[in-house]
Amino acid sequence: GEADRIIFMLTRNNGITHAVAKSIRKPNSKFGARLEPYMHVALSLTQGRGTLRTITQTTTLHAYTAPIMGDYTAYTTAAVIAETLTTNTPPEETPPHYALTHGALATLAHKKHHPHHILARYLTQAMQLAGWPLTTNTCIHCGTPTPTSYHTPHGTLCPTCAHTATT
């Protein structure tokens, strides 16, 4: 119905999934704020019609929404984390992505580090999980191990390849 909402979620064991929260938009909803973005919750689900399940019960484990939404930089960082998660998480590799995402959001909400540092670490680790490890100790062009390197948007270059690229 009009008061229902489809909720996107990352689960510990079943990957990214969607479920219907019935009557969530009504003022007396039993779910209400528990299913806002960036919440860590425990859910009970039943099989609904078709492929969507229905949320029947929810318990808040950690409320990250308020601290994240109250800080614009933290909010935009969380949005990039969510977008990266939705585009780069294969269903068969859920546990590492779940742990990485939960850790990033918890750190962001508790303001333990600057949001840009949290995002850089998250993206680096998410890229590695997706099979695109960041290489900083070898040249991306010739493969030479190089302690002295030149950084480009595509990776690290040794002095010889950097000189060739600029001439």
Question: Where on the chain are the PLM-derived regions?
Answer:
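Non-catalytic alpha-helical scaffolds and adjoining flexible linkers that form interface surfaces
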Residues: 1-6, 10-167
